[in-house]
Amino acid sequence: MRISSKGRYGLSAMIFIAMTANTDELITVNCVSEKLGISKIYLEQVFSLLKRAKLVISIKGAQGGYQLARKPEDMSCYDILHALEQSLFEQTDSSVDERAPEIEKVLKASVWTHLDNVIIKELKDLTLKSLVDKVDSSKLNSNLMYYI
């Protein structure tokens, strides 16, 4: 599976915002851009899609920015990727439908539909909160000193 940069950057930006979800702080596109090293113009496109999907709330003005529309535990990776990667969840094209419809039928029922369902289930089970927890855990582990 190949996730576009829009999906990868959007997921990274949402994790970054979720890490500040306990505060009422608004996060600007500039802040995300600087912290993650992503183009501001590209992030504006990503946030536009996230806002349209009602995953973030935007506040305009000098003190404006973005914050999550829901708690991180109520938002899944599926929600985010579905907003940013609509082609990821499209039906697979037929490959041999005209000459071998029985093969195509088996492929669709046993492989493509099953694979889609497994991926969607895993993405729905993976919450933004669980990703933030993993980032926090990773930070703790990287700060440990090991002596021999």
Where are the regions a protein language model picked out?
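Short acidic, hydrophobic short linear motifs in intrinsically disordered regions
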Residues: T23-N30
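Key DNA-contact positions within bacterial/archaeal DNA-binding proteins
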Residues: I41
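Conserved segment of winged-helix/HTH DNA-binding domains
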Residues: E73-D97, N117
